[in-house]
Amino acid sequence: MEKYDLLIKNVLIPEKEGEWDIAVKDGKIEKIGKNIVGEAKYTINGKGKIAFPSFANMHTHISMTLLRGLGADLPLHDWLQKVIWPLEGEFVSPEFVKDGALLGIVESIRSGTTLFMDMYFFEEAVAEACEDVGIRAGLGFGILDFPTKVAKTPEEYIQRARKFAEEFKNRELVFPVICPHAPYTCSPNTLRMAKELADEYGLLLHIHVAETKEEVERIKEQYGKTPVEHLESIGFLDKNVLCAHMVWTTEKEREILKERDVKIAHCPESNLKLASGIAPVPDYVKRGITVTLGTDGAASNDNLNMLEETSTCAKFHKGYNLDAKAIDAGTALKIATENGFKVAGIKAGKVEEGYEADLILVDTDFPEFQPLYDPISQFVYSANSECIDTVICKGKVLMEKRELKTVDQEEIFAKARKWREKILSKLSSL
């Protein structure tokens, strides 16, 4: 008799007729079939549930959950300079980062995410939180030209990034990423050093690019080129580059992105809230540029809900482009799942044999799914995260029946409330 680590019985799978069993072994989907017979360490009754791939949040600053709700209704640069950076200068520490990361991880799991791509400070603390809970993450120190608590010079940032890459390069769930912040906060030399480090270790480069008109004008004034043209001119762009936002790009820049096989992390809700603009995602997709989805930080979104982000991605581009087919439900879901895992180098994002068992089970016993005609469109357009019953990462059950299995939610909430008191005290003096 076959032995499995996990057996999901009688579950629905989009675009397959009837009920199916999913057998998981060593973190992978070993078999999908009818009435699978085998001995399983753990069995889940999937009756009335739909199996989808879990979400990959490809751009966030997860510890900023502790700054959520501050500086509302400000544009990006005012929000950063008047609220976020002063508070980070005061409070960011390994303890702040881990507590914020745990809060963000709880929110992420509850909304179906098993992989996130993070750029922040003290990423060792985020790695510890991820490994404690059992969630995947690509992690990188923000590399800057100006001093912060973690480094004083670009060379020091690079040194910290190198040390982190060396320490975490062979972990099971977390992996290092090189994260120069943006072309307007990193000199050409800093960007080149970051690229050299990423290439040396075979890592992704994760960077903010062309988020606002103001940024584009600043780069043009400083370098005489648009952001993408500037990055191309210094030899930065390559297939291992993940650019967050990419809201303001020209025809020429899009040709460069396609030619260099640059990847994009689209963050529609953050771009809307900060009034940054609307990324030309349908055009990117049409050109064959790989687009992934991200929430950005919880302080600028203001949540980490990837189902909500997926729905916004699909709906907003329809309205903005006056085209109901601009981004359909299936494309939005692929952008939010399969594309992200692929960019991260993880064979997940599909409910298929041989793929990593990063899955969610969505309960159809909700009005949003009654009657059930089209699981994908009803998940993207109708459902909310309360419909997500079970979350599985690399074959490990992180949530079942909406109950978190690997983390104490109430303990994390209590820590968040303590940070609130400290932050409110500081705000009164700003």
From Swiss-Prot:
A Pfam family hit: Amidohydro_1
Alphabetical UniProt keywords: Hydrolase, Metal-binding, Zinc
Binding site for substrate: 88, 181, 211, 296
GO molecular function annotations of the record: 5'-methylthioadenosine deaminase activity; metal ion binding; S-adenosylhomocysteine deaminase activity
Cofactor remark: Binds 1 zinc ion per subunit.
EC number(s) per entry: 3.5.4.28, 3.5.4.31
Record SUPFAM superfamilies: Composite domain of metallo-dependent hydrolases, Metallo-dependent hydrolases
Catalytic reaction(s) noted: S-adenosyl-L-homocysteine + H2O + H(+) = S-inosyl-L-homocysteine + NH4(+); S-methyl-5'-thioadenosine + H2O + H(+) = S-methyl-5'-thioinosine + NH4(+)
Top-tier EC class: hydrolase
InterPro entries in UniProt: Amidohydro-rel, Deaminase_MtaD/DadD, Metal-dep_hydrolase_composite, Metal_Hydrolase, MTA/SAH_deaminase
Binding positions (Zn(2+)): 59, 61, 208, 296
Domain of life: Bacteria
Keyword Metal-binding: yes
CC cofactor: Zn(2+)
Annotated family: Belongs to the metallo-dependent hydrolases superfamily. MTA/SAH deaminase family.
Role played: Catalyzes the deamination of 5-methylthioadenosine and S-adenosyl-L-homocysteine into 5-methylthioinosine and S-inosyl-L-homocysteine, respectively. Is also able to deaminate adenosine.
Name of this protein: 5-methylthioadenosine/S-adenosylhomocysteine deaminase
Originating organism: Aquifex aeolicus (strain VF5)
Lineage of origin: Bacteria, Pseudomonadati, Aquificota, Aquificia, Aquificales
Gene name as annotated: mtaD
